């Protein structure tokens, strides 16, 4: 398949790119720097130098693909507007050339849009986003409602992604090596977790299977608590780090709405993803700490 990918150098997008290349798909990626262009071209990727903020930089280049994967995430104050314009641009590009089979558009959301819930939540659960991502469900619906005979659309909601040297779990590993891990709240809340290579496999399945439309959850369904994650990390440190539980109100003073996201208590199920034949290969952070520490260290060395 010919696939247009945004976020190819990001934490999720880079894993998706790896999975697409392993499956021998032809990938065109939107990247922001000449250095990224050179790195991707060396891997056989067609790179488009541009930016989500500048629609003209990629609008024409995005026309005529079999699938579009939007994995980029802007962190600026204008992230809602930038994301909305990117969705509109990719949908327009997908509709530019009629063809069979119909192209697909896969949008990256996240399980935080569900909010906290004591009962397990599957893909049919109502959204209840906090302040941090209050705009995201509307963007999900924009994508889903665009589905037609000429466009297949899907939304993937990753849980907290781990693996490599980026992301929330990697921050815990890094803090553990420095001797202090801070936990927002009492740590008894459950995090929905997913290994980044397993997440990338789901993207490939959704992109390549004709029934891949609608909402898909991406997590291991293991309901691991933050305390269990931290204890697993602590037990594999040469020098046992201190673990400090920070009250949510105190966490908000430094992290704002991000503290509330970290304190969410979520038990999540992914039946629609499993129906595609998808199954995570790694389960729980605490049972995979040695592997994750090695990945973290290798990633740090490459980044140095």
List each language-model region with its residue ranges.
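N-terminal Rossmann NAD(P)H-binding glycine-rich loop of SDR-like oxidoreductase domains
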Residues: 3-25
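Conserved Rossmann-fold NAD(P)-dependent oxidoreductase catalytic core, especially the SDR/UDP-sugar
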Residues: 88-132
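Amphipathic terminal alpha-helices
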Residues: 283-304
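Mid/C-terminal beta-alpha module of Rossmann-like enzyme folds, strongest
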Residues: 2, 202-258, 297-304
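Conserved beta-loop-beta element that borders a ligand/cofactor-binding pocket
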Residues: 140-164
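NAD(P)-cofactor binding segment of oxidoreductase domains
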Residues: 57, 61-106
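Glycine/proline-rich active-site loop of Rossmann-fold NAD(P)-dependent oxidoreductases
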Residues: 137, 161-173, 206-216, 222
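A conserved pocket-lining segment of Rossmann-fold NAD(P)-dependent short-chain dehydrogenase/reductase
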Residues: 174-194
